[in-house]
Design a protein with these regions (language model features):
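Glycine-rich beta-to-alpha transition loops that act as phosphate-gripper elements at the mouths
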Residues: 159-163, 324-333
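Glycine-enriched alpha-helix->loop->beta-strand junction motifs that scaffold or abut catalytic
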Residues: 192, 278, 340-349
């Protein structure tokens, strides 16, 4: 069967709503018919065999761009904020949609349309790609397919979160570990991830006597990887790059640490690519832990976020032409705390576990029992001494997202609708608290379509291999 015939077969659920011409060239004839039927193509992009999967992923991206929803970098918008050319009274939510990303993203886009929001990011971490069984092109297809389904137009910011160097693997074989990050960046950029958070903060060495010495390996390797990322840029795209100075859950970051990192990074990066833009943001630590601290009864301990530190370091970051500071691991905070991020002028906040919790809160009891039995059988080695069942299941249940991916998709439509509705309520709350409603006009002032044409051949290569990501942050 020719590639053209294969593509037509993959596109069959869309019927007469699109036209596929020689090239292949794609055009939309019936936008509503496309929106109503795109889910079937997304299913192929997620669960299809290799070639069908790649064809579906390419087709979705082409149709999204044709519909006006295009993968974009947030770089110029963040740099403008650093220059004081935009308000800084809102915080951009970066949302890790670990499970049912098509359904979750539909809820995000509905919330965005109803609030006229445009400053929001979809992301997935290196670790999450492993345990959720989602490579970059699959994740991007789910997000862009959701944009089509909801009739959303405008920039779609898709981000590689925590492209993190494993300290243990780096210690054994530095170049192999760095090559794994380089390979992942290449795969991600090909898929439309034009925002990448490089995380070499795992290599900060607190045994060194001075702060610049502690940060040296961090900023040097971040500069190396940022250089590699800049060399991957498609024509017309400036990738938004972030760095990180403090591992989530550790001590609060300080101004001397930020300055040591940025001075070192700018010196190292400038020696490699003198005329290229550097980082657009910096991730810091102000008190949270990824996924929250789990108490014996399974509830989440109250944590404090040092919003004064967040505000101060965002201000310092702007001196380095960045948009501000980024907070990780915040989705399990009490709802009344989210407005403080915007009030503190935080640039971006990363949210993940809270959305996963909503999914688990709505799963049927028999499926939950099956998941817990799976965790007992496959991940009992992760149970810590003295840990209750509630603590063990809460901390490990993310490991079930990949193995149960298809079962989540096959939940009854009423149950899926219930989960989507709960997610939408949460996204609406977050968009309001973070003050991103009404940001479309200001974002579109700085973010324009790149005009990038994506070749089908880029989606028909071999699948990326699996890797051990058990020691990486989410």
């Amino acid at each position: 069967m020719s590639t053209m015939d294969e593509l037509i077969r993959v596109a069959k659920p869309l019927g007469e709503s699109i036209h596929i011409g020689e090239g292949p060239q794609i055009s939309i004839r019936n936008p509503k018919g496309l929106s109503d039927n795109i889910e079937a193509v997304v299913r192929t992009a997620v669960f299809g065999e290799n070639r069908s999967k790649g064809l579906a992923q390419w087709l979705i991206r082409k149709l999204a761009v044709e519909s006006g929803a295009f993968p974009a970098s947030i770089h110029h918008f963040y740099r403008a904020r650093g220059r004081g050319e935009t308000p800084d009274d809102f915080t951009v939510p970066a949302m890790n949609l670990r499970a049912l990303p098509f359904h979750a993203a539909r809820a995000v886009f509905r919330s965005a349309v109803s609030t006229d929001a445009c400053a929001f990011i979809f992301e997935i971490a290196r670790s999450e790609m492993g345990y959720t069984d989602q490579r970059p092109a699959e994740y991007a297809a789910a997000i862009l397919g959701a944009a089509i389904a909801e009739g959303y137009s405008g920039p779609v910011f898709i981000q590689g979160d925590h492209f993190q160097v494993s300290a243990s693997r780096y210690g054994k074989d530095p170049e192999t570990e760095l090559d794994a990050i380089r390979s992942l960046m290449k795969e991600s950029v090909h898929a439309g991830f034009f925002n990448i958070d490089i995380d070499t903060s795992t290599l900060v060495d607190l045994s060194k006597k001075t702060i610049p010495a502690q940060q040296e390996t961090n900023y040097t390797l971040c500069a190396d990887l940022a250089t590699d990322a800049r060399k991957l840029e498609p024509e017309g795209v400036t990738i938004s790059l972030g760095g990180e100075i403090g591992e989530v859950g550790g001590e609060n970051s300080t101004e001397p640490e930020l300055r040591a990192f940025m001075d070192g990074f700018n010196r190292e990066f400038g020696s490699r690519l003198p005329d290229a833009p550097g980082l657009s943001k910096i991730s810091i630590q102000t008190g949270t832990s990824h996924g929250g601290i789990v108490l014996p009864d399974g509830s989440i301990a109250k944590v404090s976020v040092d919003f004064d530190t967040l505000q101060h370091l965002s201000k310092v970051a702007k001196e380095y032409q960045m948009g501000g500071a980024v907070q990780h691991g915040a989705s399990t905070l009490p709802e009344n705390m989210f407005s403080h991020f915007a009030e503190s002028n935080a640039l971006e906040v990363h949210l993940a576990t809270g959305f996963q919790n909503i999914l688990y809160d709505h799963l049927p009891g028999d499926m939950l029992e099956e998941i817990y039995a799976y965790l007992d059988a496959k991940h009992s080695d992760e149970r810590k001494e003295g840990q209750t069942d509630e603590q063990f299941y809460y901390k490990t249940r993310k490991r079930a997202l990949g193995p149960f991916k298809q079962q989540f998709w096959e939940l009854p439509s009423e149950k899926l609708g219930e989960i989507e509705s709960a997610w939408e309520d949460q996204f609406q709350l977050l968009f309001g608290s973070l003050n991103v409603g009404g940001t479309r006009q200001i974002v579109e002032r700085f973010i324009k379509p790149s005009g990038l044409d994506v070749k089908l051949s880029a989606y028909l290569g071999a699948d990326a291999g699996e890797e051990d990501v058990s020691d990486l942050a989410d």
